[in-house]
Every structure is written in C-alpha cells, then in structure tokens.
C-alpha cells in the first residue's frame, strides 16, 4: 500500500503531483515597537477563519498587508479573518496594530495551503466479479472523481473514496482509469479487472526476434504455457520440459523473468535464464530482471483469429536467453550454448480452443 499524500496535491508513492508547504514552514514572529502583545493566535489552515490578537492598550488602528486578510478592532482586541487559501503554497502577511500615532506592533500572519491525503495504490486491481473498494480521504476542500469507463464508478462522500466495478464478462482482463481532481489539478488512477485462472493462465505464443544461421534476423514463435505451481509461476516453453520460473506481479498484473533461474534440462544440458534490459546489460545475477504488464488488444484478435487479445511485451531492446550449461551452477565457464536467444519478446495468449502449433516452427505471420 502506497501513501498518496497531497498538500494541495503533495504526493508520495505511485502518483506524482505538485507540492505545497508543510506545517513546519509556519512562523509567527512578533516584531514589537512599544506595544505589548498579550496574546496572538495568527496561524490559519487553508479553510481560513477568524482569530484574535490582544494587546496592552486600546487599539486606534489595525490593518493587514494582504487582501486575503481583514481586521476589526474593539478595545484591546484585534480580530483577523482570512479567506480560504486555494493556492498550492502556504502564504504569509503581517498585521500592523497601533495604539497611537507613535506606538505600534507588527505581527506575522501565516496560512497553510490545501491538504489532501489518500492511502491507496497507484493501480487498483480487482477480480472479474462485481466489487468495490474504499479508501479514507482527508481533504481540506474535498475531491472530485470521474471515469469515462462505463464499468468503473468512483464516488467520493463522507471522507471516503469508493471505486465500484461491474462484473467483467468480456472474457479477458480489462484496464481502465478514473480521475481525481483537487486544487492542484487532475491525476489519473489505473484500475484493472482480472482473474489469473480465467484471464491469464493458459497457452501462449512466445514471439522473439532471433538471428538465424545466415546471420539474418527472423521472428520466431514458440509454444508456451503460463501456469501456477503451488505458490510459484512458470512459463513452459516448447515441448521439451523447459519451465522458466516467472514472477507474477499481482499489484500491476505483469510478469518478470530473473537471471540465474533453473528452467529444467534439455538433453545433457541444464537450462538457465540470462536476461537484460538490453544486450549490454545481460548478467547472470538474479537481481537482473526483465518485466512487462499484461494488456488487451482488440487489434491482435482482428489480425490473428486464434488469439484472445491478451498481450505482454518485455520491451523491444530487452533480451532473453535460455542458456545451455554443463553444470547446475550457472557461470560463464559452464555456459556452452543456448536453447533460445533473442530480443523483442512478446507473449500472445491463445484462445482456449486454439490448437498449439508445432514447437519452433517459423511463423506464418508477424504480430508486432
């Protein structure tokens, strides 16, 4: 859970907006010139309001040096009233108080900017069934919420933001968004409806750009299958028993592949993963990852009828190698060849009724 903290939209975590001053910026220094101040309450929140200053002696005249602050006097009392502050920053001015033509004092007046705080993730993930989730909102002036996606209904009332989603009967994951609006502007929040077993698990084409024996780049399709094994996830590649461990990111609905992971055996070789954000960043370190998020593309279904439209890409420069090692301890010395190697890796989910193509066949189409 990431805290989204706005000071007129001051944000920490997934969302990124503008910053206003903290309460620590407030000062109330009093510059006295012969008039003794008995009591002064001169710090205001963004809503504004009225507070009091008491001095020794009757006040003959008092005024504020900013249009957003007004003064009234009665005896030794000066009341200061501030208007609501809808600016991004806190603001400061002074009030001058006189008890005679020569006796006066100057008092600092400070007012905070708007404040809104939400504790919520940057991406909200809900199941395919109809449901809702609520988050507490602390806000000076409140927020406005809206969504152009018919299946997402955001609502703000009584200090809470509630997001309600309709049942997902589309047969695939779906992504949408809603907008939060406050004094600082607008911020979009992602919403995903997905069920791993229904929408992501199953058969895929793994598409990858490889270099053939003639040193020409070719786009190849491999049969693949995304499955859950206990608490772990694997991507089976081909029909030779190779199972690539993958990390399922439930918070963003994506996959990562780490380097140095054992993926089974092929003939006498141990298969291990080597990945990098680009060829120059390849490493056997398990901290080296390539990652991508699942999306739905209707264009893909129009292009290839066998596909259900669910797509994930690890990025065009990202490189995936399933290396063949002569030892289960993966190293440069034990690396002998590769089972698979290329860039621009995609996963395309097949419809459940689609029969698998022969493993390692050259594709008759290109999807990218």
Show which residues each predicted segment covers.
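A short beta-strand micro-motif common to beta-rich folds, especially ectodomain repeats
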Residues: 89-101, 171-184
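Predominantly extracytoplasmic/ectodomain segments of secreted and cell-surface proteins
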Residues: 24-56, 105, 112-138
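Bacterial N-terminal signal peptides that target proteins for export
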Residues: 1-9
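Extracellular interdomain linker/stem segments of modular secreted and single-pass surface proteins
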Residues: 111-119, 193-200
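Ser/Thr/Gly/Pro-rich, low-complexity flexible regions
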Residues: 193-368
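Surface-exposed binding patches on compact interaction domains or structured appendages
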Residues: 35-41, 47-81, 132-163
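Bacterial Sec-dependent N-terminal signal peptides
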Residues: 10-43, 100-102, 108, 357-368
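Short, surface-exposed loop/turn segments at beta-strand-coil junctions that are enriched for proline
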Residues: 83-88, 166-172
């Amino acid at each position: 859970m990431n805290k989204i903290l706005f000071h007129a939209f001051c944000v920490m975590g997934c969302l990124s907006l503008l910053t206003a001053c903290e309460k620590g910026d407030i000062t109330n220094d009093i510059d006295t010139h012969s008039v003794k101040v008995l009591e002064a309450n001169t710090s205001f929140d963004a809503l504004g309001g009225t507070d009091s200053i008491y001095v020794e002696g009757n006040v003959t005249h008092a005024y504020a040096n900013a249009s957003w602050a007004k003064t009234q006097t009665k005896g030794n009392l000066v009341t200061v009233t501030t208007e609501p502050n809808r600016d991004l920053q806190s603001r400061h001015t002074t009030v001058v108080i006189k008890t005679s033509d020569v006796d006066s004092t100057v008092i600092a007046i400070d007012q905070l900017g708007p404040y809104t705080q939400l504790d919520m993730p940057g991406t909200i993930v809900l199941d395919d069934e109809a449901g809702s989730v609520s988050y507490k909102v602390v806000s000076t002036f409140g927020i406005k919420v809206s969504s152009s996606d018919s299946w997402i209904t955001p609502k703000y009332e009584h200090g809470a933001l509630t997001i309600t989603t309709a049942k997902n009967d589309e047969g695939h994951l779906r992504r949408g968004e809603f907008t939060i609006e406050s004094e600082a502007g607008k911020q979009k929040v992602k919403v995903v409806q997905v069920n791993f077993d229904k929408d992501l698990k199953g058969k895929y084409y793994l598409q990858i750009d490889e270099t053939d024996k003639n040193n020409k780049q070719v786009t190849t399709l491999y049969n693949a299958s995304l499955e859950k094994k206990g608490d772990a996830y694997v991507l089976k590649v081909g029909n030779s028993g190779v199972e690539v461990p993958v990390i399922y990111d439930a918070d963003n609905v994506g996959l990562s592949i780490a380097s140095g992971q054992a993926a089974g055996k092929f003939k006498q070789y141990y298969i291990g993963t080597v990945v990098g954000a680009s060829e120059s960043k390849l490493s056997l370190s398990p901290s080296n990852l390539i990652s991508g998020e699942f999306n739905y593309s209707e264009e893909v279904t129009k292009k290839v009828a066998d596909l259900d439209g669910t797509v994930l890409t690890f990025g065009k420069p990202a490189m995936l190698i399933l290396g063949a090692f002569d030892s289960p301890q993966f190293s440069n010395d034990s690396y002998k060849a590769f089972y698979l190697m290329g860039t621009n890796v995609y996963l395309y989910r097949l419809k459940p009724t689609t029969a698998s193509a022969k493993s390692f066949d050259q594709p008759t189409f290109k999807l990218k």
